Regions:
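N-terminal cap/lid segment of alpha/beta-hydrolase-fold proteins
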Residues: 1-30
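Short beta-strand element of the alpha/beta-hydrolase
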Residues: 34-43
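Short amphipathic alpha-helix adjacent to the substrate-entry channel of hydrolases
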Residues: 49-67
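Alpha/beta-hydrolase active-site loop
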Residues: 81-100
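Alpha/beta-hydrolase fold nucleophile elbow
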Residues: 101-112
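Mobile cap/lid helix-loop segments that gate and shape the active-site cleft of serine hydrolases
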Residues: 135, 140-175
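Short beta-strand/loop motif that positions the catalytic acidic residue
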Residues: 179, 185-187, 191
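C-terminal catalytic histidine-bearing segment of alpha/beta-hydrolase fold enzymes
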Residues: 200, 209-248
Length: 248
C-alpha cells in the first residue's frame, strides 16, 4: 500500500527488466515532477537496502526519488549478477522514467557498490549528471582492498586472473569520454569500506579524458558522513544538481 505524506507518495513499484519482475522504492511528489533522482544502492541483499529515509535526503516538492533494489534482492526476481544483468535494471528504469517525465532533469546517485553501477550505465542514458558517493570506481581495486569480500567476488564473478574477461567487462573507465554527463565525486578520507583511492583514481582518469567533473572530499569522514558533515554533503550535491540544470 502506498504511504501518503503532505508532499509525496511513497510506494514500492515493480517493473520488467529482461522479463524479470524487479522492485524499486519510489517517492513521487504531489506537484509537477521537475527533477528525478535515481539512487543506486550499495551492498547486497539486506545490507545497504533502499530505505525511505535515504530517499528523503534528496526529495523536495518537485523531485521524484527512486531506488531500484536490483534483481535477486529484496523480493525482485532473478539472481544478483554483480554488475552484469543488474545493469539492465538501472537502464530500463531510467528509460521508463524518461518516457513518463520527458521534461524532467534526471540525476543518478551511486553509493558504495552503486558507484560502479552508475559508471557502467550513466553515459548511455538520458541523465543530466552523475554523483558517485563513497563509490567503487574499479572492480580490481575493490578486490584488492576488500579481503573480506574476495570469496563473494570469486563466487559471483570469478578470480581476477583466471577469469580476466569477467573483470574487464566490469571496467567502466574505457567507456567514459569528454561527452559524458558531468560527474561529482564525493568521498570520505577515512572511508574503510571503499577507500578514497577509488575517488582519486576516478578523478585522475576523468582529468585525462577531459570529462567535466568536480570533487568533494571530507577527509575526516568515513563511509557515511556524521550528521553535520552529512548536511554539508547533501547541500553540495543539491547545489551541483542546480548548477547542472542551470547550464543545461
Amino acid at each position: 500500500m502506498p504511504i501518503e505524506s503532505f508532499t509525496h507518495q511513497l510506494e514500492e513499484i515493480t517493473y520488467l527488466s529482461d522479463d524479470l519482475q524487479v522492485k524499486a522504492l519510489m517517492m513521487t511528489p504531489h506537484h509537477e515532477v521537475k527533477r528525478i533522482v535515481v539512487y543506486l544502492r550499495g551492498g547486497k541483499g539486506q545490507v545497504g537496502r533502499v530505505r525511505a529515509g535515504r530517499l528523503m535526503q534528496f526529495s523536495d516538492s518537485q523531485t521524484l526519488v527512486i531506488g531500484p533494489y536490483y534483481r535477486g534482492n529484496n523480493g525482485s526476481e532473478g539472481k544478483d549478477e554483480f554488475y552484469r544483468g543488474d545493469l539492465n535494471d538501472v537502464t530500463e528504469l531510467l528509460r521508463l522514467l524518461h518516457d513518463k517525465y520527458p521534461q524532467a532533469f534526471i540525476h543518478m546517485v551511486g553509493f558504495s557498490r552503486g558507484g560502479l553501477q552508475g559508471l557502467l550505465t550513466f553515459q548511455d542514458l538520458p541523465v543530466n549528471s552523475y554523483i558517485i558517493w563513497g563509490g567503487v570506481s574499479d572492480i580490481d581495486l575493490m578486490y584488492e582492498e576488500r579481503v573480506d569480500l574476495r570469496g563473494m567476488l570469486r563466487r559471483m564473478i570469478g578470480h581476477p586472473k583466471k577469469d580476466r574477461a569477467a573483470y574487464e567487462a566490469r571496467q567502466a573507465i574505457p567507456n567514459i569520454n569528454e561527452n559524458s554527463p558531468p560527474i561529482l565525486i564525493v568521498h570520505g578520507g577515512k572511508d574503510q569500506q571503499v577507500g578514497i583511492h577509488h575517488a582519486y583514481y576516478l578523478a585522475d582518469q576523468l582529468e585525462l579524458k577531459g570529462d567535466t567533473h568536480e570533487t568533494f572530499y571530507q577527509m575526516a569522514e568515513g563511509h557515511v558522513p556524521r550528521p553535520p558533515a552529512m548536511v554539508e554533503t547533501l547541500t553540495y550535491i543539491k547545489e551541483f544538481m542546480n548548477q547542472v540544470e542551470l547550464h543545461s
